[in-house]
Amino acid sequence: MMLSVFGLSVPISATELLLASFVFCLVFWVVRAWQPRVPKGLKSPPGPWGWPLLGHVLTLGKNPHLVLARLSQHYGDVLQIRIGSTPVLVLSGLDTIRQALVRQGDDFKGRPNLYSFTLISEGQSMSFSPDSGPVWAARRRLAQNALKSFSIASDPASSSSCYLEDHVSKEAEYLIGKFQELMAKVGHFDPYRYVVVSVANVICAMCFGRRYDHDDQELLSIVNLSNEFGDGTASGNPVDFFPILRYLPNPALDFFKDVNEKFSIFIHKMVKEHYKTFEKGHIRDITDSLIEHCQDKRLDENANIQLSDEKIVNVVSDLFGAGFDTVTTAISWCLMYLVTSPNVQEKIQKELDTVIGRERQPRLSDRLQLPYMEAFILEMFRHTSFVPFTIPHSTTKDTSLSGFYIPKERCVFVNQWQINHDQKLWGDPSEFRPERFLTPDGTINKALSEKVILFGLGKRKCIGETIARLEVFLFLAILLQQVEFSVPQGTKVDMTPIYGLTMKHARCEHFQVRMRT
């Protein structure tokens, strides 16, 4: 038998033809078997063809948020890719994401059972573990209440309005003194290395009731690992989708395991010390508050759900992480924009002088009277979108979205970067323009500000969002009231985001400050 292929005659036996037909049918049957049966009236999400075995991992490259944003322009706000053999639903568009995470929040509140997540808090992280049931919900409420009690609740021992204001004020004043000292010694500095410790000190004060020296090696060893943690938990980590990578030599994975082990040892140590000194009726911080709940043996008023000693460590670990990395990254990006847009810095300082003056320190209660500063922070959140994806979600049951069928336990990527750079929403998304958030009368455009998505939405929304926004505001207000940031003329400042769970910028060692007169 002769088979014609591209105009060429190729000899082939009947047996070979039969075998080829059998293999083709087998592959077709396996592919069909893997695909979920779509209920009548619904469709499967569209998406590009991927490579066998690899899926779209090569397509995603080093900046998956950008690639997936471009794909959404072609395939729509609900599309599907494969990483390895794992199907992944990708959501874009503000309305679509609100529909999924808010209006259908119960359907999309799960977490995928990814390998990298099992390495965080011994697989029991409130933020990363697949659990989304009653115990998880009760732990989340407890964590929120504890965080609120030792952040925005009033501090009877201080003249500040709340614990957070007291802690941030002290750390901001320390930074101003440190920056002056560095200017006198060497004439320039990298602010990130000092901001990161000050922010860590704020969450340490709330969680553990203590402040560290900026050269304390124990704390430095923890805070300097934040970049590596973000690399390991970023959406699309190959080790989560190609199991063989867990067994091959993998320095990045080994390092990620080491990061989590060191962090776990640190948190265990702090919680153990609190148990030794705990006094009922004398609650000093978040950890004490959780211990008290543990000893009361009830986590929820309406359910017999208990908080074990081990879970305290996991909750504290989540709160420390939520209150640390995001705030550090936000303040660091703010400083970068201030030195690259000196006119913006000048406007913020003029507003501070008009509203507060120099006779007293800024307070959290001043926030509503400083709309330009608030607009600057909102525009930094939007323009950087430094949390490009939420932590991956997972569907808790078979569901549908925008006419597409989504089966249970489908991994879901939520592209926050795409929302914040959607031309239909922003017109000129590439431009850094804080004024876009101001109304003609100079107040914040609330409707537009709510379209900036950085902390997630719905039932998995970041529990530290309110605290983070307040902390970033107060750090900046105190710093900018007293000092002016700059870099030497002609210095190139690299503003290129580096992909990760939170996207950082290249470190800049050329910062300078001068005291405002």
From Swiss-Prot:
Upper taxonomic lineage: Eukaryota, Metazoa, Chordata, Craniata, Vertebrata
Pathway: Steroid hormone biosynthesis; Lipid metabolism; fatty acid metabolism; Cofactor metabolism; retinol metabolism
Keywords: Cytoplasm, Endoplasmic reticulum, Glycoprotein, Heme, Iron, Lipid biosynthesis, Lipid metabolism, Lyase, Membrane, Metal-binding, Microsome, Mitochondrion, Mitochondrion inner membrane, Monooxygenase, Oxidoreductase, Steroid biosynthesis
Cellular component terms (Gene Ontology): endoplasmic reticulum membrane; intracellular membrane-bounded organelle; mitochondrial inner membrane
Subunit structure, as described in the record: Interacts with cytosolic chaperones HSP70 and HSP90; this interaction is required for initial targeting to mitochondria. Interacts (via mitochondrial targeting signal) with TOMM40 (via N-terminus); this interaction is required for translocation across the mitochondrial outer membrane.
Subcellular location: Endoplasmic reticulum membrane; Mitochondrion inner membrane; Microsome membrane; Cytoplasm
Binding residue positions for substrate: F229
SUPFAM superfamilies named in the record: Cytochrome P450
Similarity comment: family membership: Belongs to the cytochrome P450 family.
Record InterPro entries: Cyt_P450 (IPR001128), Cyt_P450_CS (IPR017972), Cyt_P450_E_grp-I (IPR002401), Cyt_P450_E_grp-I_CYP1 (IPR008066), Cyt_P450_sf (IPR036396)
Residues linked to a glycan: S72
EC identifiers of the protein: 1.14.14.1, 4.2.1.152
Topology term for the membrane: Peripheral membrane protein
Catalytic activity entry: an organic molecule + reduced [NADPH--hemoprotein reductase] + O2 = an alcohol + oxidized [NADPH--hemoprotein reductase] + H2O + H(+); estrone + reduced [NADPH--hemoprotein reductase] + O2 = 2-hydroxyestrone + oxidized [NADPH--hemoprotein reductase] + H2O + H(+); estrone + reduced [NADPH--hemoprotein reductase] + O2 = 4-hydroxyestrone + oxidized [NADPH--hemoprotein reductase] + H2O + H(+); estrone + reduced [NADPH--hemoprotein reductase] + O2 = 6alpha-hydroxyestrone + oxidized [NADPH--hemoprotein reductase] + H2O + H(+)
Region (Mitochondrial targeting signal): 34-45
Mitochondrion among keywords: yes
Record Pfam families: p450
Record's function text: A cytochrome P450 monooxygenase involved in the metabolism of various endogenous substrates, including fatty acids, steroid hormones and vitamins. Mechanistically, uses molecular oxygen inserting one oxygen atom into a substrate, and reducing the second into a water molecule, with two electrons provided by NADPH via cytochrome P450 reductase (CPR; NADPH-ferrihemoprotein reductase). Catalyzes the hydroxylation of carbon-hydrogen bonds.
Single annotated GO MF: hydroperoxy icosatetraenoate dehydratase activity
Record's protein name: Cytochrome P450 1A1
Residue sites binding heme per the record: C462
Domain of life (superkingdom): Eukaryota
Cofactors: heme
